[in-house]
Amino acid sequence: MKLCMRPLWLGGLCLASFALSLPHTAQASAAPQLTTETTVDDLQTIQLEAFHKVIIMGNLQVQIVQKKGKPSLSLPPGNHLKEALEVQLDHRDGTLSLRPRKGKEQTCENLPLYLTVNELTDLEILGGGDVDFPKGIQTNALCVQVKGSGTVDFEQAVQTQGNLSLQVMGSGHIELEKGASCLAYEGRINGSGTINTEGKLRCTSKLNAEISGSGRISFEHIQCMAQNIKLQGSGKYYGIKVRASTTQVNILGSGEVYLAGKTHQANYSVLGSGYIDALDFQSEQVEVDGRNPRSTIRCHSDLIIEGKIQNNCTLEYTGKAHLNLEVQDGNVRKI
């Protein structure tokens, strides 16, 4: 499969339009049609064909706004931008890619880009790019991946009819300033990155949060059917105001989980030196599994606490719960 490039010179900016030479049995997608115009803000605007996936490479600064009409990319005019930015539009899967050209990375670092989209289902940041959503976004489903030290900031609420997936691989950061609503939520960190959600997160079904490494996931307000938390390493999870029917917490390592709010049924498992503080997390039924001398589980129950506490693991609890515990060299006390 050959990659053919046809450069387009637009107002001093060179954009590479790509088309793939496919075998004769397959039809190659047409090259994207791009035009330019000058807006009232004297920005150079490039009209784009439809896409729903965006990949941003390098240390670009991009502001994304959802609006009706033809999608576009706007940037300040000037001959110094010549050959600085490479734009690819792949018709096969509807992907728009933005990246600095080789040797032009410093030119693009301070280059503000303004991208308008109709529909956005996937956003991928490769490197240290900064992406900002100043307005709310509505979509069927959304997957955001930060691979590196990049940042994604949603200044207004995110609304999806389906799943909302936020993933950080590295030291990057994702911020939901006004919360979100979705069918199901997935937050995943592999590394030292962070995912922070202010406002209210409403999940019709389940919330899954997973940290591998030293990352942090925090929520200001959660409403969901099922809350599932898994930590491997030294990561931290914060759920401040939680309303969930069921809650499952699994810690493999020295991770820490802090919960407050209310749930009907909770299951807490620590198989390392981890720490769970759920004293302010009201629950009727609690099941515990602690097996390490440096691990601590703190919980609240007004009905029953059952399970195993072994090897000098410490269980501290509040409430009127009946205890049905198998204790082997463990520490259990009411506080």
Region annotations inferred by a language model:
Residues 2-12:
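Bacterial N-terminal signal peptides that target proteins for export
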Residues 12-13, 22-147, 151-169, 173-190, ...:
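Acidic (Asp/Glu) and glycine-rich low-complexity loops/linkers
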Residues 216-218, 222-276:
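Eukaryotic tandem repeat interaction scaffolds
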Residues 259-299:
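Intrinsically disordered, low-complexity segments enriched in Gly and acidic/Ser/Thr residues
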Residues 305-307:
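Extended, low-complexity amphipathic alpha-helical repeat segments
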Residues 313-316:
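Short, exposed beta-strand-loop hairpins at the edges of beta-sheets
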